[in-house]
Amino acid sequence: MSNSAQRDARNSRDESARASDTDRIQIAQLLAYAAEQGRLQLTDYEDRLARAYAATTYQELDRLRADLPGAAIGPRRGGECNPAPSTLLLALLGGFERRGRWNVPKKLTTFTLWGSGVLDLRYADFTSTEVDIRAYSIMGAQTILLPPEVNVEIHGHRVMGGFDRKVVGEGTRGVPTVRIRGFSLWGDVGIKRKPRKPRK
């Protein structure tokens, strides 16, 4: 989008108007793309990301993307984004991995049976401010990696196995909440906060 088009988009709305969750998610995705392209250093990206989720007006969000290429945000019709569909990740006598940049659906189920899996949310794009993960391991193992800023709620059960119930560190206010439920039977569900790796 050209600079003049960006100005027109900004002029079509009130800068002091309240931003929606959809607007905050859009800017978070733009920041993730900028970091992936090397336009933002890791510390700058994480700082802007936290500020994006805490922003309440269009003006605050526009400041975060003012020096980056990409579309300016505009008012939404209906106020809802199109979230990714519910997803099921299976590892039956095998494994699954979901890493890198991908859209996190609002609901996600992971299941390992005599297998293993890795679910890495650190570089993913959240499509909702609340994410529900159902994690099940039966004689298998899986690891869920969380970025430092997300809020986490865990309600898991274990029988002759492991299911992490706490993660080190606190999330940032306003950032998406990840709720993890499930159980392990002779298996393991590991849940960890892990810093993003600086771009080389």
Swiss-Prot record:
Outline the inducing conditions.
Answer: Highly up-regulated during the early stages of invasion of the human blood-brain barrier.
Pfam families referenced in this protein's UniProt entry, alphabetically: DUF1707 (PF08044)
Q: Which residue stretches belong to region Disordered?
A: 1-21
Query: Compositional bias of type Basic and acidic residues: which residue ranges?
Result: 7-21
Cellular component per GO, a single term = plasma membrane
Per the UniProt record, which residue ranges are transmembrane?
Answer: none
InterPro entries listed in its UniProt record = DUF1707_SHOCT-like
Q: Which domain of life does the UniProt lineage start with?
A: Bacteria
Name this polypeptide is given = Uncharacterized protein Rv0966c
Q: Which organism is it from?
A: Mycobacterium tuberculosis (strain ATCC 25618 / H37Rv)
